[in-house]
């Protein structure tokens, strides 16, 4: 760790990215060194396991690349993938990158409007989907120019195989040799606070440097012959995508769990040593364990054991560690409850990498107290995932780690986190003005997040300058997109979309007292006050329809699940809106916290801090 004259902190990288270092080379190098190592495992729908060695996977990548060339995919073409986390996704990604094409991920949950924007903005020429239904959705929103759409369940892989006829590995190598590390490898679209999402252009160098930086500080976790990582997060997410390539380029085995419904059976079969999760998954595991314990003696036993785990973890961070008494109580808790939860997560699990959203302190201490090493970090799509990450032995709960090697982090005078280095994007795709807004000097990327750095270089996130919501599941949500749609409803005077650190998106409405009389008369209802109207089934039904319409413009994960009508008015006089009638979001959230809590059945957590650890969160767009 080194502190620079400008106040930034950095760690010197041990790997220097070369002019022609590209993402597929990471696997190719491993295939040469360890051709017989198992690289990938995936369970089939009938429970059998498919395994491929590094040399077998490399041949599959080259063969698929031949087929893509045969289909007419050119260097620089943008090709989209709309599919679950799977071996097929990986294979297509590596093959596309091997011939100089650009991979454009599309979330399975993206709305038709979002897909249409991505296809148009990135000038996508071909789309591969998992299902016919997805292919039909893409066809329905495809722009006027021709976009080829192929689905795996309609024989896309066989089509690629047929197209490979007459194309040789030499053709692939010629394409590969022409690729520069500075070429764009992918365009990732992140949710923004206004308008359509911007495309984050990331280069091969971004991925290679970030992967090597992660390996430098977390080698024992992600680059060991004992490493087994089960990937179930969407690989459209930058962190999952990065980790996928990191594991493949190391010595470990990568597994896939395409459906969250089969996650626990997949964990039991794969026996991971490390899991990459978002906090919502950890919450579900905890809640499921608590629910299974139920009430009575078992419920009290679980609550007591969970408390001992948290207490033990907190004490372990102290200079002298936990006392003998705490160790004894922890041992009892482990025998009664904790080891049973660990067994659900697999006998080999040693590490959990949590990213994408903040993780509550009490939940972090619970898992740490179970004997699992919890690793958190901070980053955005614009930084190829992690720009800061905790090191083993230097991972206090609440912090998000040290700068990833090859990157610099400093705090601006207003508290904003500024970053630069090998992991930072060159810019937004074809948007120089918007790029200049976040990189005004062409070097330092302004994250929009607030934080602090201690004397050891440990970064702590304290808040956000921008209003982007990050749900407990790690999904970025633009509240304005929904609010602008809902504000057109005649009954709605004000709306605020909420959901930060919550399991789903919600909204608070205030009724328009001026418009209400006409609306009631139009619908044949007696005149009443806004307070009384809030109780009318017809009013609620009308608002439900408005919410359904607004939700059509966003993905399922961004959709409003619940709303409340509150008895309030937001005016300039009472400080809830500005003179230009913009909502003072933080004031509303603070003053109406009880109404927000009511949407979710209570506060986030009595012990949950305001600190945030974010891997791969998209910046304001």
Please describe what each predicted stretch is.
Residues 35-38, 167-189, 196, 222-228:
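Conserved pre-ATP/AMP-binding loop-to-beta segment of ANL
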Residues 36-94, 111-116, 204-205:
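Conserved AMP-binding/adenylate-forming core of the ANL superfamily
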Residues 46, 133-181, 289-340:
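ANL superfamily adenylate-forming
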Residues 50-55, 185-211:
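Conserved AMP-binding A3 loop
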Residues 71, 98-163, 167-169, 174, ...:
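Structural core segment of the AMP-binding/adenylate-forming
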Residues 108-140, 210-230, 260-274, 489:
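Conserved ATP-dependent adenylate/AMP-binding module captured primarily in the ANL superfamily
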Residues 208-228, 235-338, 348:
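Conserved AMP-binding/adenylation subdomain of ANL enzymes
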Residues 403-412, 416-471, 488:
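Conserved ATP-binding/catalytic segment of the ANL
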């Amino acid at each position: 760790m080194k502190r620079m004259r400008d106040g930034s902190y950095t760690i010197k990288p041990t790997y220097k990215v070369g002019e022609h270092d590209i993402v597929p080379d990471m696997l190719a190098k491993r295939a040469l060194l360890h051709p017989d190592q198992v690289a990938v495992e995936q369970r089939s729908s009938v429970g059998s396991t498919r395994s491929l060695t590094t040399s077998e996977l490399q041949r599959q990548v080259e063969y698929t690349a031949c087929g893509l060339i045969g289909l007419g995919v050119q260097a620089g073409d943008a090709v989209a993938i709309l599919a679950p986390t799977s071996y097929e996704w990986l294979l297509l990604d590596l093959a596309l990158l091997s011939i100089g094409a650009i991979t454009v991920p599309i979330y399975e949950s993206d709305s038709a409007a979002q897909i249409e924007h991505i296809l148009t903005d990135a000038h996508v020429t071909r789309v591969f989907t998992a299902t016919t239904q997805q292919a039909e959705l893409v066809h329905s929103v495809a722009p006027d120019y021709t976009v080829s759409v192929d689905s795996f369940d309609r024989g896309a892989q066989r089509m690629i195989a047929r197209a490979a006829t007459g194309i040789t590995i030499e053709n692939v190598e010629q394409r590969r040799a022409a690729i520069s590390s500075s070429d764009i490898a992918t365009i990732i679209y992140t949710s923004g606070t206004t308008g359509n999402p911007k495309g984050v252009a990331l280069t091969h160098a971004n991925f290679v440097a970030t992967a090597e930086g992660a390996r430098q500080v977390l080698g024992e976790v992600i680059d060991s012959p004992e490493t087994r990582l089960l990937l179930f997060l969407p690989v459209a997410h930058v962190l999952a995508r990065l980790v996928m390539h990191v594991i493949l380029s190391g010595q470990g085995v990568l597994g896939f769990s395409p459906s969250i419904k089969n996650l626990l059976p997949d964990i039991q079969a794969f026996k991971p040593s490390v899991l990459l999760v978002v906090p919502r998954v950890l919450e579900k595991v905890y809640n499921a364990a608590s629910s299974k314990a139920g009430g009575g003696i078992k419920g009290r036993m679980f609550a007591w054991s969970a408390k001992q785990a948290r207490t033990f973890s907190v004490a372990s961070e102290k200079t002298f560690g936990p006392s003998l008494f705490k160790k004894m109580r922890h041992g009892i808790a482990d025998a009664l409850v904790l080891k049973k939860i660990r067994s659900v997560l697999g006998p080999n699990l040693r590490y959990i990498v949590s990213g994408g959203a903040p993780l509550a302190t009490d939940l972090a201490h619970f898992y740490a107290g179970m004997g699992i090493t919890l690793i958190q970090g901070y980053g955005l799509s614009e930084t190829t995932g992690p720009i800061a990450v905790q090191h083993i032995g230097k991972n206090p709960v609440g912090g998000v780690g040290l700068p990833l090697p090859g990157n610099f982090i400093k705090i601006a005078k207003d508290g904003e986190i500024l970053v630069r280095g090998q992991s930072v994007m060159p810019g937004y795709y074809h948007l120089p003005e918007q790029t200049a807004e976040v990189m005004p000097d062409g070097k330092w990327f302004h994250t929009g997040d607030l934080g602090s750095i201690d004397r050891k270089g440990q970064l702590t996130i304290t808040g956000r300058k921008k209003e982007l919501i990050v749900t407990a599941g790690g999904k970025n949500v633009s509240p304005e997109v929904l609010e602008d749609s809902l504000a057109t409803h005649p009954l709605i005077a004000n709306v605020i979309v909420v959901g930060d650190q919550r399991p789903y998106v919600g909204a608070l409405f205030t009724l328009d007292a001026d418009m209400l009389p006409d609306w009631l008369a139009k619908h044949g209802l007696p005149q009443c006050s806004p307070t009384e109207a809030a109780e009318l089934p017809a009013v609620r039904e009308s608002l439900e329809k408005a919410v359904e319409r607004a939700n059509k413009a966003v993905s399922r994960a961004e959709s409003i699940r619940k709303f409340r009508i509150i008895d309030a008015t937001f005016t300039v006089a009472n400080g809830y809106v500005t003179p230009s009638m913009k909502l003072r979001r933080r004031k509303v959230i603070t003053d109406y916290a009880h109404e927000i809590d009511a949407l979710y059945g209570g506060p986030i957590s009595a012990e949950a801090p305001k600190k945030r650890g974010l891997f791969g969160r998209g910046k304001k767009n």
